[in-house]
Curated annotation (Swiss-Prot):
The lineage of its organism: Eukaryota, Metazoa, Chordata, Craniata, Vertebrata. The gene is Akr1a1. It is an enzyme of class 1 (oxidoreductase). Transmembrane segments: none annotated. It comes from Rattus norvegicus. This is Aldo-keto reductase family 1 member A1. GO terms for molecular function: aldose reductase (NADPH) activity; allyl-alcohol dehydrogenase activity; glucuronolactone reductase activity; glycerol dehydrogenase (NADP+) activity; L-glucuronate reductase activity; methylglyoxal reductase (NADPH) (acetol producing) activity; S-nitrosoglutathione reductase (NADH) activity; S-nitrosoglutathione reductase (NADPH) activity. The keyword Lipid metabolism applies. The modification N-acetylthreonine is found at T2. Glycans are attached at K23, K68, K85, K141, K153. NADP(+) binds at residues 11-22, 45, 162-163, 211, 213, 215-216, 263-266, 269, 272-273.
Length: 325
C-alpha cells in the first residue's frame, strides 16, 4: 500500500486523490461530494468560477464537522481566486464569499486561478464589443501580497498557483513571504510536465494535475484530437492489471507523487478513481506511459472573434503557455 498523501511545506497532509468539481452541474455535485466522502475521499477541489460552491457547501454542511461523518480537520478543501478578483481590495471579499458559500471557516489551500487579471466586477467573463476579454492591469505579484494577508488572518492555511509558468512561479517566489505550496496545472501522459514538476519540486512546491484523464467532455473538443482513455498503451496496461483506463492514468501520476483531481459525478467512477493505491507499475511500465508525452494541451480557453475560434488569452503578456514550461 503506497502513501495516499503528500506533505506540503506548511506541514499539511494533502491527499493524492481529490474530487474535481469543474463542470459538475448544480443538482448533481451535492450527491457526488457526499458519495465521495462516504467512500474515503478527503480532498475536494473547488473554484468560485465553477458556479457550484453553494451546493458543495450544502454537502459539506451535512457531512463534515463535529458529530458528522468527517471531522473538518480530516478534510482538505481547495478553492481558487478568479481573474476578476485580482485587485488587492477584492481578494479578501472573494475568499470570504467562497467560505460563506462552502460553509467553512477556513480553506486548506487557496490558489490564484490564472496569472492575469480580468476587469473588476461581478461578471466573471467581462467582454469588449468584439468578443475579446476586458483585462485589468493588476500584476499577480500585487495579488500575491494580498493573498498572504489571508493566511495571517486564519482564513486560508496554504497558498498556491494555478496555470503559472516556471518563470512566473520564480517571479512570485521573489516577493513571497508566504511561499506557494502547490502548483495546479493540466497534466496527463500526453502533457507530462516533467520540466515544470522538477522546477516545482526543487522549490518546495507540490504539483496537482487537473484533467488527469484528458478532459474529453470539454465544449470546445476538437473531433480529431487524441483521446487519452483510448490510447493503446493505456488499454494494454488496463487489461494486464485488471483495471480501468482511468485507474492506469491516475496510478501513473500518484506513483510520480503528483496529486490528481479527477472530476466525476458517477458513483462507480468516483469510487474507481480512488482505488489506485493497491497496485504498482514496474519501472518499465512507468517508462511506457512516460513515452506517451507529446506536450498536447487540452485546456486552452477559446473564444469566437469574427466567427473564428481563437485562444482567448494568448496575446496577453502574462499568458503562461507561451513559455517553454
Amino acid at each position: 500500500m503506497t502513501a495516499s498523501s503528500v506533505l506540503l511545506h506548511t506541514g499539511q497532509k494533502m491527499p493524492l486523490i481529490g474530487l474535481g468539481t469543474w463542470k459538475s452541474e448544480p443538482g448533481q455535485v451535492k450527491a457526488a461530494i457526499k458519495y465521495a466522502l462516504s467512500v474515503g475521499y478527503r480532498h475536494i477541489d473547488c473554484a468560485s468560477v465553477y458556479g457550484n460552491e453553494t451546493e458543495i457547501g450544502e454537502a459539506l454542511k451535512e457531512s463534515v464537522g463535529a458529530g458528522k461523518a468527517v471531522p473538518r480537520e480530516e478534510l482538505f478543501v481547495t478553492s481558487k481566486l478568479w481573474n476578476t478578483k485580482h485587485h488587492p481590495e477584492d481578494v479578501e471579499p472573494a475568499v470570504r464569499k467562497t467560505l460563506a458559500d462552502l460553509q467553512l471557516e477556513y480553506l486548506d489551500l487557496y490558489l490564484m486561478h490564472w496569472p492575469y487579471a480580468f476587469e473588476r466586477g461581478d461578471n466573471p467573463f467581462p467582454k469588449n464589443a468584439d468578443g475579446t476579454v476586458k483585462y485589468d492591469s493588476t500584476h499577480y505579484k500585487e495579488t500575491w501580497k494580498a493573498l498572504e494577508a489571508l493566511v495571517a488572518k486564519g482564513l486560508v492555511k496554504a497558498l498556491g498557483l494555478s496555470n503559472f509558468s516556471s518563470r512566473q512561479i520564480d517571479d512570485v517566489l521573489s516577493v513571497a513571504s508566504v511561499r506557494p505550496a502547490v502548483l495546479q496545472v493540466e497534466c496527463h501522459p500526453y502533457l507530462a510536465q516533467n520540466e515544470l514538476i522538477a522546477h516545482c519540486q526543487a522549490r518546495g512546491l507540490e504539483v496537482t494535475a487537473y484533467s488527469p484523464l484528458g478532459s474529453s467532455d470539454r465544449a470546445w473538443r476538437h473531433p480529431d484530437e487524441p483521446v487519452l482513455l483510448e490510447e493503446p498503451v493505456v488499454l494494454a496496461l488496463a487489461e494486464k492489471h485488471g483495471r480501468s483506463p482511468a485507474q492506469i492514468l491516475l496510478r501513473w501520476q500518484v506513483q510520480r507523487k503528483v496529486i490528481c483531481i479527477p472530476k466525476s459525478i458517477t458513483p462507480s467512477r468516483i469510487l474507481q478513481n480512488i482505488q489506485v493505491f493497491d497496485f504498482t507499475f514496474s519501472p518499465e511500465e512507468m517508462k511506457q506511459l512516460d513515452a506517451l508525452n507529446k506536450n498536447w494541451r487540452y485546456i486552452v480557453p477559446m473564444i469566437t472573434v469574427d466567427g473564428k475560434r481563437v485562444p482567448r488569452d494568448a496575446g496577453h503578456p502574462l499568458y503562461p503557455f507561451n513559455d517553454p514550461y
